[in-house]
Design a protein with these regions (language model features):
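N-terminal, non-catalytic alpha-helical interaction modules of very large eukaryotic scaffold proteins
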Residues: 1-176, 182, 291, 300
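Metal-assisted phosphate- and nucleotidyl-transfer catalytic regions
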Residues: 262-284
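Glycine-rich phosphate/pyrophosphate-binding loops
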Residues: 214-242
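Conserved mixed alpha/beta core segments that line enzyme active sites in large multi-domain catalysts
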Residues: 152-222, 276-442
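Terminal amphipathic helices with adjacent charged low-complexity linkers/tails
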Residues: 231-259, 263
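Non-catalytic, well-ordered alpha-helical scaffold segments
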Residues: 21-24, 38, 42, 76-84, ...
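Alpha-helix initiation/capping motif
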Residues: 37, 55, 68-71, 88-102, ...
Length: 442
């Protein structure tokens, strides 16, 4: 537009103070995204109208007046070009540079959000295509203006279902606390297979949601205490690695093991463990394991199970699967070999007698169970060549040990021990656990 600088009855009063460099900077910024120009102009105009800075009628009159002043025919295309230019100039005039950038990024986020939703809803979605679409969304600066709650909630549910857990009770809670960018951050610490989407399992799901709910509450109510509460450095191995391992080594018949008679479980499970021990992961997975071991360094770790059913609503599976502690000392190859053995042990525990009997007792035997893995640094203090974990425990939402009428069952119970958590789960004989009713903890 040649000049929209004078005031007058043609509707250009709001365009009279435009600083040319600001309008030019805005146009240069939005020109980087030519496919989004219509959406950006539409958003800009909506903002101007909502703030009472410009009406649609005023804009149309200003565009028509400028076309006539320049001696051009009032063709539809010409009017559209002038209208777009006047929107840009008005937006640059009335909004700060930071606001302009926020609204440009809002349009970009909406566009990438729609693409992410399209990929997630497709029947051929893979871990790679979803991750690429998610990363494109998260690469856009967060800014101070967000996509609508409805858009965000739909994408959150789809991502959580795709990557973490599809259980409806979990999704109903997690979608309120776990953001799209949170999921991206989790995946930055996830190992997986490109051909198998996989999920992170029930234990991982519970950890993620508990962290997102509890830490902000502590920060708001007791910041001094919150400083001492931290989630250990954590990595996830998705169930896609388990699926690839089963396919690669032709272990599909092991899925029928759960239908055998109880007397055959122990011998069969020992055979499965031996077969897992001699089996191999794909070279790509081993390469990911090696990078993880190098990243962790020489620090003790725990390899933890996270099956789809584990720690789900109404189903604890406490102590049913194997967790493996590793000293993780020495050269990389030795640590890698020990890590691979630990992962195999944890994966094989899905076929153990305890979880299968538990599933049978709860009517879950026909469920297509899968296993993911959580890898965490062991928390403790070093003393010479040793690492001493301070304390661990198991928390129950219902307290069945009410040794006093004052204790409220529904407030829960903590079984607290010194040292590693296995002492709380396995109830080691001769140990000294502390049973703490949460209704009366002191």
């Amino acid at each position: 537009v040649s000049a929209a600088t004078e005031h007058g009855p043609d509707g250009s009063r709001l365009l009279g103070r435009t600083v040319p460099i600001r309008a030019y900077n805005l146009f240069r910024a939005i020109s980087k995204y030519p496919q989004l120009l219509p959406q950006m102009r539409s958003t800009f105009l909506d903002v101007l109208v909502e703030r009472g800075l410009l009406s649609r009628e005023e804009l149309a009159a200003a565009a028509k007046a400028r076309v006539e002043a320049d001696g051009l025919p009032a063709a539809r295309e010409t009017l559209a070009d002038y209208t777009d230019a006047l929107i840009d100039m008005a937006f640059a005039e009335w909004l700060s540079a930071d606001e302009v950038e926020n609204y440009i990024n809002l349009v970009r986020k909406r566009d990438r959000c729609q693409e992410l939703g399209r990929v997630l809803s497709g029947s051929h979605a893979t871990a790679e295509t979803v991750w690429r679409a998610l990363k494109e969304f998260c690469d856009i600066p967060k800014g101070e203006i967000y996509i609508s709650p409805e858009e965000a909630e739909g994408i959150r549910v789809s991502l959580l279902s795709f990557y973490v857990s599809s259980q409806l009770p979990f999704l109903g809670i997690a979608k309120k606390y776990v953001t799209i960018r949170d999921i991206s951050a989790i995946l930055e610490h996830t190992l997986g297979h490109v051909a198998y989407p996989g999920r992170l399992g029930g234990k991982a799901a519970g950890m993620i949601v508990a962290q997102k709910i509890l830490l902000p509450i502590l920060a708001g109510h007791d910041p001094d205490f919150e400083r001492h509460i931290a989630v250990p450095d954590t990595w996830f191995i998705s169930s896609g690695v388990f699926s690839d391992f089963i396919d690669r080594n032709d272990f599909h018949l092991f899925h029928t093991h759960k239908y055998r008679e109880r007397e055959a479980f122990d011998a069969e499970y020992q055979l499965i463990g031996e077969r897992f021990e001699s089996a191999s992961f794909s070279p790509d997975i081993i390469a990911q394991f090696r990078r993880l071991i190098e990243e962790i360094g020489e620090h003790p770790i725990i390899v933890r199970s996270s099956s789809f059913l584990e720690d789900s609503f109404g189903l604890a599976f406490s102590g049913k699967y194997q967790s493996v502690f590793l000293a993780n000392q020495g050269d990389v190859e030795a640590r890698l070999a020990a890590f691979v053995r630990g992962v195999k042990t944890s994966l094989a525990s899905m076929y153990g007698p305890d979880p299968i009997i538990y599933r049978r007792d709860h009517g879950l035997l026909d469920y297509d169970e899968r296993m993911a893995i959580i890898v965490q640094k062991v928390v403790g203090r070093r003393l010479g060549d040793y690492l001493f974990p301070f304390a661990a425990g198991v928390m129950y939402s219902r307290n069945c040990y009410t040794w006093s009428p004052k204790i409220r069952k529904d407030d829960g119970l903590v079984r607290l021990v010194f040292g590693l958590g296995t002492r709380a789960v396995d109830r080691v004989g001769g140990d000294y656990p502390r049973m703490v009713p949460l209704s009366h903890p002191l």
